[in-house]
Amino acid sequence: QEEAQAIDQELFTEYKFSVDQLMELAGLSCATAIAKAYPPSSFTTSQPAVLVVCGPGKALFRSLLLLQGYEPTVYYPKRPSKPLFEGLTTQCQKMDIPFLPEFPAEAALIDELYGLVVDAIFGFSFKGAVREPFGSILSTLERITVPIASIDIPSGWDVEKGKADGLQPDMLISLTAPKKAAMHFTGRYHFLGGRFVPAALQEKYALNLPPYPETDCVLQLT
């Protein structure tokens, strides 16, 4: 966890990446990975309905580009009052992407309405107890049967140790580099995304990242 935070900090300070720049690149990676694993044609319904569940941090940026080509609905209960996040919310609204006023209380309702859930609630920096409303949200998501795609780390997991009795996503998209908890991931699809880590930084932290194929921004690990 500390190493991942240090890499992020160096990208911002030493390499002068901006927050929105990294979030857009990460968002493109997430969109590409999900489109590869769950193309719209693979949905059993005529409309590829996707529920994107967002936490209070940067996660919504990672999901923005995913929304193209699908029928997304966003649940975003804790919205930071910062221009970066307010601007993105406005963009979604201008694209007629609906925001749920309340999270579906029943897992069966999510199974009925959506073919995929994107878990963009917590990132690798999360620690401590899960607060409401996210505790109830995760409890519901643990009971659904439609696939879950988690971004960077399944929400509620310890970034080092994972969580055997927590969320068990079908897909994990590791950004920058896989976190230690990824060793406990047992889903079908594990992708690496975020093709923006300079070679010198990879070498400094001994990341040993596999090469990305050609011009792709994601790499399927499993």
Where are the language model's segments positioned?
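Catalytic cores of large soluble enzymes that bind and process phosphate-bearing ligands
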Residues: 15-18, 22, 26, 80, ...
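Nucleotide and nucleotide-moiety/phosphate-recognizing core
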Residues: 32-120, 131-150
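Positively charged, low-complexity intrinsically disordered leader regions
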Residues: 1-48, 201-222
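YjeF_N-associated NAD(P)HX repair module
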Residues: 114-222
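Amphipathic, alpha-helical segments enriched in basic
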Residues: 1-5, 9, 112, 116, ...
